[in-house]
Amino acid sequence: MVSSSVYGQEELLDRIYVLLTSLGYEVWMSHRGSVPTNSNETTLESCLKAVENCDSFLGVITTDYGTTSPGEISITHQEFRKAIELKKPRWFLVNDRVIFARQLLSKMGYKTPEGRHRLGLKTLKPCLSDLRIIDMYEEATEKRIEDGQAKVKWVQKFYDTDDASIFTQTQFYRFLDAEKSIREQYPDLKKRGGRR
């Protein structure tokens, strides 16, 4: 599954879709209309169910926060949280402007979501549509302190579509290789409860 806000990101998402389908993946992506839906479910319910049922997850953090209702976090943000909660095999891309905005606000003393909220800015237009984009990035890194050292998960910064494409192709080709190896080593995996 590819999770991202769509507005202004169509070219990037189209490229990722083509890359992943050319590697043989069935890609669930709302932009392409390929997320399984049910007429009895809300958009959010269908999206979260897709996260639950996907084999792997690519989250793309752009400068647009995505679809949200007043007082709620965006669908994309909720998808990210669900993938992390379920410990899905996952990768994240982040637009370089998100990193820049986070660093700028940190240097100004606004290092936490609470601090950024107290700042009173909802947006840093034209850079970011919503400051919660920085929260998404921080959640994707899953930063924790272990043995006195900060530990974070990899979130790949990208400047343009080519940068994002290189990371996507490299990571998902390697994942496909690993998946093939597991299937060869455990031919009865499906009988044991595996999906494939």
What spans do the regions from the language model cover?
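Conserved catalytic or regulatory cores that recognize and/or transform ribose-phosphate-containing ligands
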Residues: 1-196
